[in-house]
UniProtKB/Swiss-Prot annotation:
This is Large ribosomal subunit protein uL30m. It is found in: Mitochondrion. The gene is Mrpl30. One of its GO terms (cellular component) is mitochondrial ribosome. Component of the mitochondrial ribosome large subunit (39S) which comprises a 16S rRNA and about 50 distinct proteins. Keywords: Mitochondrion, Ribonucleoprotein, Ribosomal protein, Transit peptide.
Length: 160
């Protein structure tokens, strides 16, 4: 049926040329950027600023040795690699802090899930605790590890 109609009513050739001209103008690539040679982000954005260190409490010459990492967002509807990283870091339970070393391999894993976690430096105002005092330490929400001193009772001397 379509063949009969085409033979009965041929299209004028001028109309086809108009469509071609319109198609060429749409296909034209002068509005597309072909080369990505220059970065759109200025280099000064990536340079460290002293205000950042004051704001976040870091010292670039003496970085902290340990991180306190807390998961603050859910892993539901997140990709499997983020869930695997959260499990690897031991952050399955939300709002329970974990302590990790400040080394490049751990920092690379933290960078993958940085939008799901909070990272704080571990502050040791009383120094690193020993094995005996490890059981009597308390981790504050500010990131300080405080050793709770237990008072030993004074032995009463027997009255003579």
């Amino acid at each position: 049926m379509a063949g009969v109609l085409r033979s009965a009513f041929p299209r004028p050739p001028c109309r086809l040329q108009t469509v071609k001209k319109g198609a060429e103008s749409l296909i034209g690539t002068e509005w597309i950027r072909h080369k990505f040679t220059k970065s759109r982000i200025p280099d000064k954005v990536f340079q460290p600023k002293p205000e950042d260190h004051e704001k976040y409490g870091g010292d670039p010459q003496n970085p902290h040795k340990l991180h306190i990492v807390t998961r603050i967002r859910s892993t539901k509807r997140r990709p499997y690699w983020e869930k695997d990283t959260i499990k690897m870091l031991g952050l399955q339970k939300a709002h329970s802090p974990q302590i990790h070393k400040n080394i490049p391999s751990v920092n690379a894993k933290l960078k993958v899930v940085k939008h799901l976690i909070r990272i704080q430096p571990l502050k040791l105002p009383q120094g690193l605790p020993t094995e005996e005092t490890m059981s009597s330490t308390c981790l504050k929400s500010t990131g300080e590890l405080v050793v709770q001193w237990h008072l030993k009772p004074v032995e009463q001397e027997a009255k003579s």
